[in-house]
From Swiss-Prot:
This is Meiotic driver wtf23. Residues 11-29 have a biased composition (Basic and acidic residues). Residues 1-98 are annotated as: Disordered. Promotes unequal transmission of alleles from the parental zygote to progeny spores by acting as poison/antidote system where the poison and antidote proteins are produced from the same locus; the poison component is trans-acting and targets all spores within an ascus whereas the antidote component is spore-specific, leading to poisoning of all progeny that do not inherit the allele. The gene is wtf23. Pfam families: WTF. The lineage of its organism: Eukaryota, Fungi, Dikarya, Ascomycota, Taphrinomycotina. One of its GO terms (cellular component) is ascus epiplasm. The keyword Transferase does not apply. Residues 57-72, 89-98 have a biased composition (Polar residues). InterPro entries: WTF. Belongs to the WTF family. The chain crosses the membrane at residues 105-124, 139-158, 170-192, 202-221, 234-256, 266-283, 328-350. It comes from Schizosaccharomyces pombe (strain 972 / ATCC 24843) (Fission yeast). One of its GO terms (biological process) is meiotic drive. Keywords: Cytoplasm, Endoplasmic reticulum, Membrane, Toxin, Transmembrane, Transmembrane helix, Vacuole.
């Protein structure tokens, strides 16, 4: 018995049969298929692996389950349409147009920003709607018409100018980023250069403070400039503080903790100078034209400059001087201590010798 149709067991078989019944213009009409003896191959057998899932799984039984008791999956038009909608729903975004209200609002904001400078200028000149004549009102009407045309153009070409604004903002942001990076590199190079020439920079600072303090001293003493004494005292103290801070070349002068340590040393030095000067003046009973504060400021200023010059000429001289003074004091104190220990040992030794004399010898010495 020859059949001109295929038995339909599922929707997939129905779809396969529908495709097989179509005539291929290149291969001609479909040949007849004898399902009993199998003498004639199915139509377009080279495409059978793409048509019949069970034929595809004939060589590989694990690929499809050919058990007739199991219902094959439903590949109907509804499931295909659902799959098609799912694939397209996650692929592209919604390209719905922007609402007219949003277009109008952004266009109005643009016109408002454009008119803000003009309104501010007229308000600053006190000419906003004041003493307007015929010509001024004509200009105002023309300007309103221009703004209206610009508003309509912005509303109509909303997508175009929004894209242009976005591109411009991105370009400006990149320019700002490049400029900031360039300035940061310049600052880094300048700071490295200043650090490498820090000795020369400190000499320049010292010269500037020296000139300023000398000018202030001269003006105050000559009477040409009436300054408060606190100004000259603070100037001298600040100069000494600055010079002592930057005196150690090997230590970065921008280190906060070491700067505080230098300030503490300056205050201790200042207190020592005050005590020495006041004690000397009290012991000698002499009176100078300058007060104790003026002498203190002058000595502190001179001492700071001398120490600074010594450090500039011989880096590390202050540290070596401090160590030398400390070692000298330790040596002197050690010598004094050794001498005292020697005397103590001598007295102790004499007492021990007297206590160790035999009694017979003491009697003989007594008889003699």
């Amino acid at each position: 018995m020859k059949n001109k149709y295929y038995p339909l067991r599922s929707s997939m078989d129905e779809l396969s049969a529908k495709n097989d019944n179509e005539i291929d213009l290149e291969k001609g009409p479909l040949p007849e298929y004898n399902s009993e003896d199998g003498s004639t191959l199915p139509p377009y057998s080279e495409n059978i692996n793409l048509k019949d899932p069970k034929q595809m799984g004939a060589n590989n039984p694990n690929l499809f389950n050919t058990d007739e008791s199991t219902t094959p999956p439903d590949y109907g038009e509804d499931s295909l349409s659902i799959t098609h909608r799912e694939n397209h729903s996650s692929g592209t975004a919604d390209n719905s147009s922007t609402s007219p209200l949003k277009k109008a609002f952004l266009s109005f904001i643009s016109i408002f920003v454009l008119n803000v400078p003009a309104v501010c200028y007229l308000t600053y000149k006190d000419a906003l709607f004041k003493d307007y004549g015929k010509d001024e009102w004509v200009y105002f009407g023309v300007w309103c018409a221009i703004c209206l045309m610009i508003f309509i153009s912005l509303w109509y070409f909303y997508e175009t100018w929004i894209k242009a604004v976005k591109v411009t903002v991105i370009f400006l942001a990149q320019c700002i980023k490049v400029t900031v990076v360039f300035l940061a590199q310049c600052v880094k190079v300048i700071s490295i250069g200043l650090f490498n020439i820090r000795r020369e920079m400190m000499i320049i600072i010292w010269l500037l403070w020296l000139i300023i303090c000398c000018i202030l001293f001269g003006c105050v003493k000559s009477g040409d400039l009436n300054l408060n004494k606190a100004l000259i005292y603070s100037t001298c103290t600040i100069s000494a503080v600055l010079l002592l801070i930057v005196s150690s070349v090997c230590i970065p002068f921008w280190t906060f903790e070491r700067t505080l340590a230098k300030l503490a040393k300056v205050f201790l030095l200042q207190s020592g100078i005050v005590l020495v000067l006041n004690g000397t003046m009290f012991l000698r009973g002499k009176h100078f034209e300058w007060t104790g504060c003026e002498i203190e400021a002058s000595v502190l200023f001179i001492m700071g400059n001398v120490l600074f010059l010594c450090e500039m000429e011989c880096p590390g001289a202050l540290i070596r001087t401090r160590n030398s003074i400390r070692n000298g004091i330790a040596f002197i104190l050690g010598g004094i201590g050794n001498a005292m220990m020697g005397l103590a040992n001598a007295f102790r030794g004499g007492n021990d010798n007297n206590n160790n004399i035999p009694l017979g010898e003491m009697d003989v010495e007594g008889e003699v």
